[in-house]
């Protein structure tokens, strides 16, 4: 997968990167009481959409907050709906001796592998139902499994790095956490972009 290195630093090439990441960190702080979550998710969906079309910069502006809130809230609900069957599977497996920890890994990996498809498809169309196109999702997963595994590993790495913000107390955590999310959603878009560029079927609406 190309541009892995870019995911660490592309955001810092935006002329207003500090201001945009600082605002994102502020919304992350509000996310501690849930209020900021839709705004953060709405912004990240824009990043994924841009990346899926091969566009890195500029980072989306923090404008049209109403639109960001609505799309982010819908995406949050989508995540909850997906978590229900995954949670049921978890509780079925967790009571089987010796494989409880495997259940946790299985659930986490399963959701991580399908999330790029869900995020980009919803970000492109804004259609709630498009996030539940299971046949398209399965085809995308089979055709892009290698890159999806890379993104999964990279997302773990970014979240580990984000916690180094603890060294700078709470504000540092929020700043590095938002940076990590920008990097992860950038990679979500890149998976789709590279698949479409090389002719691999994605079933992700091209809008």
Identify what each model region corresponds to:
Residues 2-30, 62-88, 114-164, 192, ...:
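Interfacial aromatic "cap" segments that immediately flank transmembrane helices
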């Amino acid at each position: 997968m190309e541009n892995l290195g870019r995911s660490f630093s592309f955001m810092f090439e935006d002329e207003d990167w500090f201001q945009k990441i600082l605002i994102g960190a502020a919304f992350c702080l509000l996310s501690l009481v849930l209020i900021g979550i839709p705004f953060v998710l709405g912004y990240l969906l824009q990043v994924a959409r841009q990346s899926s079309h091969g566009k890195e910069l500029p980072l989306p502006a923090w404008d049209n907050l109403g639109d960001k809130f609505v799309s982010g809230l819908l995406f949050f609900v989508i995540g909850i709906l997906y978590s229900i069957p995954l949670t049921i599977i978890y509780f079925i497996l967790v009571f089987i001796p010796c494989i409880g920890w495997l259940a946790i890994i299985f659930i986490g990996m399963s959701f991580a592998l399908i999330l790029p498809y869900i995020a980009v498809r919803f970000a492109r169309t804004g259609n709630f139902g498009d996030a539940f196109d299971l046949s398209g999702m399965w085809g995308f997963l089979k055709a892009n499994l290698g890159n999806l595994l890379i993104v999964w590993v990279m997302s773990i790495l970014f979240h580990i790095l984000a916690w180094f913000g603890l060294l700078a107390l709470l504000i540092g955590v929020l700043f590095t956490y938002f940076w990590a999310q920008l990097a992860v959603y950038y990679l979500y878009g890149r998976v789709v972009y590279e698949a479409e560029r090389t002719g691999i079927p994605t079933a992700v609406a091209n809008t």
